[in-house]
Amino acid sequence: MSIQKIDYEFIHPELNYEAEPNFQPAIKVSVYFKKREGITSETFFHHWQTVHADLAVATEAFQHHILRYAQHHQTPEMKERARSLGEGVLDYDGCAQLWVRTWDDWMAFYSSKEYAAALSDDCNFFMQLPMTYMIGYENLIVGDASTAIGGKDGFRTQGQ
């Protein structure tokens, strides 16, 4: 593979052209969605962080295949702050972030009849379908890794 390089003197040697990426040992699945019309943002976020999270975590498919689950709540206030930057803003209200060890783990979870039975009606209650996916690897630059999955920390900056 040929990479086009520019003439650049790196401030952080951890990031130079020869440095290996710090990919975490998991696949990160980000699932973007909007709240269903007819419900308030408060209902959407509260339902998602309580009922929906509980239903998801309670499934055996989740217990056997999901390493990490986080919710990214983009509230109306945060959406307005993002718009004030004058840049584009993703038109979603939430992003569920799930980590799995392998693609087979994701497919076992995603295609589980138990998961579908537990969450299908609930999804219809509070979110618009279809959902939008982004799937890849996390390259941790700065910050702490999840030690539970054997991740490697990023490097430290002066402010840390």
List each language-model region with its residue ranges:
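Macromolecular interaction modules
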Residues: M1-Q160
